[in-house]
């Protein structure tokens, strides 16, 4: 089943003293992608690479769900692109000495000069009626602007995040 998900979330302006213009958030996975926003089948952690909600960025995710060439075997493929909506003057105005590594995830604050992209491949195999095997692979690439964050921060931040997981689920 092909699908597309797109959104726009407001971001901060360049003034750190007039309150945040970002969308308020509740700390829960937003299952748009497997690694970036916490939609993975074996994902039990609350930490997400890109955060928990769409605040401060716009994005597009294309997916092909439930691809099947064999009975009881299904695949899902996703590709996502995310671009910040926070003003690129904010990091300097707020005296951010390092890239924010918030509880939402290390890539959770993107400015209008920053972007990230993600690829996911998920496979599920129903071994028995009550037993299912899942294999997930996900990769996120962060692209930070050196003019916004400075050379030191851009060079220090890990820009590649990936996960490969295998899980079994037994249903009673």
Where are these regions (language model features)?
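Outer-membrane beta-barrel strand-turn architecture
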Residues: 10, 68-70, 125-129, 172
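Extracellular/periplasmic loop regions
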Residues: 1-78, 83-108
């Amino acid at each position: 089943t092909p699908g597309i998900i797109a959104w726009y979330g407001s971001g901060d302006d360049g003034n750190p003293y007039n309150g945040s213009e970002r969308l308020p958030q509740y700390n829960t996975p937003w299952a748009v992608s497997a690694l970036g926003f916490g939609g993975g089948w074996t994902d039990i952690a609350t930490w997400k690479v890109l955060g928990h909600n769409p605040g401060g960025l716009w994005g597009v995710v294309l997916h092909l769900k439930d691809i099947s060439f064999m009975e009881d075997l299904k695949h899902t493929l996703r590709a996502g692109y995310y671009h910040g909506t926070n003003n690129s003057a904010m990091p300097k105005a707020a005296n951010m000495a390092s890239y924010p590594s918030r509880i939402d995830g290390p890539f959770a604050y993107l400015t209008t000069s920053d972007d990230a992209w993600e690829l996911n491949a998920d496979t599920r195999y129903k071994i028995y009626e009550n037993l299912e095997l899942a294999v997930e692979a996900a990769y996120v690439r962060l692209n930070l602007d050196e003019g916004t964050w400075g050379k030191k921060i851009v060079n220090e931040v890990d820009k590649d995040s990936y996960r490969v997981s295998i899980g079994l689920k037994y249903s009673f």
